Amino acid sequence: MKLKQLFAITAIASALVLTGCKEDKKPEAAAAPLKIKVGVMSGPEHQVAEIAAKVAKEKYGLDVQFVEFNDYALPNEAVSKGDLDANAMQHKPYLDEDAKAKNLNNLVIVGNTFVYPLAGYSKKIKNVNELQDGAKVVVPNDPTNRGRALILLEKQGLIKLKDANNLLSTVLDIVENPKKLNITEVDTSVAARALDDVDLAVVNNTYAGQVGLNAQDDGVFVEDKDSPYVNIIVSRTDNKDSKAVQDFIKSYQTEEVYQEAQKHFKDGVVKGW
């Protein structure tokens, strides 16, 4: 082989190699946007959470998608199954009972939000002393809010419980009822809507807000601010340390979110962090 031919072959081979390198070098794909899907209760709490989503987008580039629920039956199952990444709609006593009843062993508390005090509402009385003998009173029927409501009634001097510290008390634990109040358990989601038919309803802020009631403005009596029922953010053991979950927690625990909560609940909301 002549020297000129050898140089020509070498040059062609080099060109092919360089061309191949150029073709293989592709632009890097843009990183997928950080996303999180969070379950919330409909009403004012959802509106408060939307501010957390705004903070998350501005500070961390996190896209937050909320899924609304009208009751507490499904949000924990949705997180456990992976349909949601997290939820922000309950307190620890409720989570403990729900997880135990449904065997949701992969749920974990990752942060606190607010304490939303429980309150007693009425269209017939302005003061608890106006409650007549045999008056109709409704309390939530889910285990934790039921006990919470009964403890609140005891603090108003209306009843006495077997154990005032038992968060899972039921109407069967009432040992004194001097006014012979007719205390009935109803579904948590309908307690506030029963006000036309009863003398007093003990309702949590989620459902009170859905019918336009505010604990401080409309409550006959309100739970103390030192309540142990701080609301929480819940995720799973497999995603609790993920950037999306941690950034959402930081976004929720901000002054912007607290200010929005005060707009909706006034003095009826207390920081839990």
Curated annotation (Swiss-Prot):
This is Probable D-methionine-binding lipoprotein MetQ. Belongs to the NlpA lipoprotein family. A lipid is attached at residue 21 (N-palmitoyl cysteine). This protein is a component of a D-methionine permease, a binding protein-dependent, ATP-driven transport system. It is found in: Cell outer membrane. Keywords: Amino-acid transport, Cell outer membrane, Lipoprotein, Membrane, Palmitate, Signal, Transport. Residues 1-20 form the signal peptide. It comes from the Bacteria. CDD domains: PBP2_lipoprotein_IlpA_like. One of its GO terms (cellular component) is cell outer membrane. Transmembrane segments: none annotated. A lipid is attached at residue 21 (S-diacylglycerol cysteine).
